[in-house]
Design a protein with these regions (language model features):
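Acidic, glycine-rich two-metal-ion catalytic cores of nucleic acid-processing enzymes
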Residues: 207-311
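N-terminal leader/targeting and assembly helices and adjacent pre-domain segments
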Residues: 1-209, 299-351
């Protein structure tokens, strides 16, 4: 027997639609960061071979001066760095050379930065391409939910490309791409240097950096979900402005993974012009799955039918008040229910 339509199912489908872009974006971020890591590994191995790292104590190698081939490699990498960062990095390189401070340890740190910054343009282009589709989807879905809530339909104008770009830039621009990569600069260079100081051979030094890819895969998933949620939220806001919506209702997903902060905000009404991401507008935190719906005029809302919710534990569909929130769900259908029926989790616990 097919499950009856349910209010929160609509919300979950909306969020799932946006998050369908999460895997492609996360994979793209992982691919790009892996390229930076592989570049650093290759550059460091070349340095170690030229400097005969295996034939001397690591401290002596690290404090030795970087050779001309390393400097030439830095110049080549610098060409791929976004122009806004190029001059500052080059001044740092030439300053260290002029003052005889370009040791191998400093060269490793500089190569880590150059390899990470050399992929920023690719990261920005790839992310913008995916988020543009999320922004368009979010605009139309925000409008569709408004039509569904009011029971009225109208022709929807296409969102202009310039507005899409504004939305995307507000969520993820070049400084955001740099913010994403900067921890990798520090982490990867420290990993290389510490591995050398421990006396590891070149192969093990390379593997220690390669192991960072696993941590970055997790981070890429979190970043992808967060920026997608924020993009969809900004697109909803664009739809609200377009159609004269002055207030919105914060809407959380009803399941056991919803955090207490989002649960408390569920159903609360906020003025559109006072929306603040992370305060009263999603995403509230990394991996946030919340969204918003337009606040309908109270007189119109009073004429509308109640919402329906299907209890997963019993399969029974109930009519619920339109102001039924996460706390009500938690106590009535969720883990806090006291009617003798066991709550049916939506997610399996990991061992």
């Amino acid at each position: 027997m097919a499950k009856a339509p349910s209010w929160n199912d609509d919300i979950e489908r909306e969020v799932a639609s946006y998050q369908g872009n999460m895997t492609p974006l996360a994979k793209s971020l992982s691919r790009i960061t892996n390229r930076a890591i592989d570049g650093l590994i290759s550059d460091v191995r070349a340095m170690m071979e030229r400097g005969r790292y295996a034939d001397q104590p690591a401290a002596i190698f690290l404090n030795g001066f970087a050779d001309s081939a390393t400097i030439i490699r830095m110049q080549a990498l610098l060409k791929a760095v976004p122009e806004r960062y190029r001059e500052t990095i080059w001044k740092s390189i030439t300053g260290q050379i002029a003052h005889h401070r370009m040791t191998n340890i400093r060269a490793i740190r500089t190569l880590a930065r150059l390899n990470c910054y050399a992929v920023l343009d690719d990261m920005l282009y790839t992310t913008a391409r995916i988020l543009s589709e999320v922004a368009k989807d979010g605009y139309y879905r925000g409008t569709f939910v408004l039509q569904k809530e009011t029971g009225m339909g109208w022709a929807v104008d296409a969102i202009k490309g310039g507005r899409v770009q504004v939305i995307v830039d507000s969520v993820f621009d070049m400084p955001d791409a740099r913010r994403y990569m900067d921890p990798l600069v520090d982490f990867s260079s420290k990993t290389v240097i510490n591995s050398m100081l421990r006396g590891l051979p070149p192969d093990m030094v390379s593997k220690s950096v390669d192991d960072i890819k696993g941590a970055m895969r997790f981070r890429s998933k979190r970043e992808a979900r967060t920026v997608i949620t924020e993009t969809a939220g900004e697109a909803h806001m664009e739809a609200y402005k377009k159609h004269g919506v002055e207030q919105y209702v914060f809407t959380a997903t009803w399941d056991e993974r919803t955090c207490p902060v989002c649960g408390r905000l569920d159903g609360q009404v906020f003025d559109r012009d006072k929306a603040q991401v992370g305060v009263n507008y999603p995403p509230m935190h990394p991996n946030c799955r919340c969204t918003t719906v337009a606040k309908i005029d109270p007189e119109l809302e009073a004429l509308m039918r109640q919402r329906r919710y299907t209890d997963d534990a019993t399969g029974v569909t109930h009519e619920i008040p339109r102001n039924f929130g996460y706390k009500d769900w938690y106590d009535t259908f969720g883990p806090g229910r006291k009617d003798g029926v066991a709550y049916k989790p939506k997610f399996k616990k990991k061992d």
